[in-house]
Amino acid sequence: TERFARSDTSVTAQALKLVSANPDAMLVVASGSGAAMPHKALIERGYKGKICQTHAAATRDLMRVGGKDVEGAFVVSGPAVIPEQLPADHPSKALATDFVAKYEKVYGAGNRNQFAGHAYDAVVVLEKVLPVALKAAKPGTPEFRAAIRDAVQNMGRTVVSHGVLNYSKANHWGFTTETGLILKVVNGDWKVE
């Protein structure tokens, strides 16, 4: 395990140490353009194994900054990043497509990202649970906060742009197995694996 700070301008020492261990695969935990620096450093030092990134790297910045060095990278993602590649019967296809259309109309083509998709999904959840909570309690009270919690935990299967949620008292993660995708950088773009 090696660490780096967002403000670091080089991760050469960490990359050399990791490459010398010759693991089959490595996981980079960083976001956006910051995920490109360690990835590039590993490739530049001759690493040939698989390099995986977290969902936080599922932005165009990874490819913009990483260039050819991030070709073949694996990234976990929710469907909102690549709705065009989802099969027609995927539960999130419609909402993911709607999210991308609305987001890119305001911020420009190719600017979609995981984080904006999660904000869109938060609105979907709030639109479902707030009416329930408002029937149970007055906003601004402890009872209202409890009513929101209870409504979320009992909202049932809810399709969002990043997959399907099904919260419960025991499951605050919420996402079902229909959610996650593995993307690979191929020719400077995302491809569902």
Locate predicted features.
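Extracytosolic ligand-binding ectodomains
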Residues: 1-193
